[in-house]
Amino acid sequence: MISRYVAENKTFEKQFLDGSLEVELNPQGTLAERIRAGGAGIPAFYTPTGVGTLVAEGKETKEFNGRIFILETALSADFAIVKAWKGDKAGNLIYRKTARNFNPMMATAGKITIAEVEELVEIGELDPDQVHTPGIFVQRIFQGENYEKRIERRTVI
């Protein structure tokens, strides 16, 4: 599991502690850049984020202009699963709010991208200037039915 945060899932915790699940934590910006690089065909990049921490353990480092950087490799996947607000039957996608943070780059980093949309429209109904992910990156699209967002842990009274 490569993640920036793994929450408080008891099953996840048990699998990690018994050794059946491997975990690699990345700072959020580094994780985003690894995914973006994978989608762009860039094999690796250097970042100063994480130098001198557990994040850097076992990774190649290099000094540039007196500053140490960590070599991070790109991430890509066989499948990318994204959720968009609206999409057309050609796979063009529009995201809303924070869904614009990771979904567009995730779509580029998957060999096969599967998109769930709240509203599926005909080709030509989306304003091209509003499209965040072009259909070239989407191989499967469907309209979802249920959008329940559970609270992970209540932190306010």
For each predicted feature, which ranges?
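Conserved alpha/beta enzyme-core scaffold
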Residues: 1-157
